[in-house]
């Protein structure tokens, strides 16, 4: 996992904003973050959805989760984005649980072309890999915060209007 993160050009210490820019460059997309109250109390704690037409990826997190938890959820979803070859996303319909989850929780009025989400536990190899990569990413963010303690950035700002 360490090698993959290095291969993607992620510095040892990075701000959250810089990390997102690295992942956007790798994927060729814009990444947005959404606090979604419909995820509050759900079995799935986060989701990555994307639209290949608009080239926008969205990371959904529970609105009631603590900021630190949201950071780890975002790291996990960014881990999926870095682990996958751009364009190889799971299509809706590949797994009926994905379709059901997106229809019932995230966006009932709109079809989302693809999604990764954590319906399975971390015994699923893809989920475990994203979690390990996400942990490495969060560690690099925390190192970046330590090195740049004078910066006035708060993670929760990624969800501001």
Where are these regions (language model features)?
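Metalloprotease/metallohydrolase-associated module, dominated by Zn2+-dependent proteases
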Residues: 2-10, 14-19, 88-161
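Active-site scaffold of zinc-dependent metalloenzymes
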Residues: 29-71, 78-84, 90
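Auxiliary, metal-adjacent structural segments of Zn-dependent hydrolase domains
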Residues: 1-49
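Short amphipathic C-terminal alpha-helix that caps PH/PH-like domains
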Residues: 75-78, 134
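Short, well-structured alpha-helical patches and their helix-loop capping segments
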Residues: 66, 70, 74, 122-129
């Amino acid at each position: 996992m360490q090698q993959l993160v290095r291969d993607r050009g992620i510095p040892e210490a990075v701000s959250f904003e810089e990390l997102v820019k690295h992942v956007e460059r790798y994927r060729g997309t814009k990444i947005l973050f959404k606090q979604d109250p419909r995820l509050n109390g759900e079995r799935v704690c986060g989701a990555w959805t994307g639209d290949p037409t608009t080239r926008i990826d969205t990371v959904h997190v529970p609105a009631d989760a603590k900021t630190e938890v949201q950071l780890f959820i975002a790291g996990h979803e960014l881990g999926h984005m870095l682990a996958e070859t751009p364009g190889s996303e799971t299509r809706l319909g590949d797994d009926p649980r994905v379709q059901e989850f997106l229809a019932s929780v995230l966006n009932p009025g709109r079809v989302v072309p693809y999604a990764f989400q954590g319906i399975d536990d971390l015994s699923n190899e893809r989920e475990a890999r994203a979690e390990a990569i996400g942990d490495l990413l969060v560690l690099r963010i925390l190192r970046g915060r330590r090195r740049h303690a004078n910066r006035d950035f708060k993670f929760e700002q990624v969800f501001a209007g």
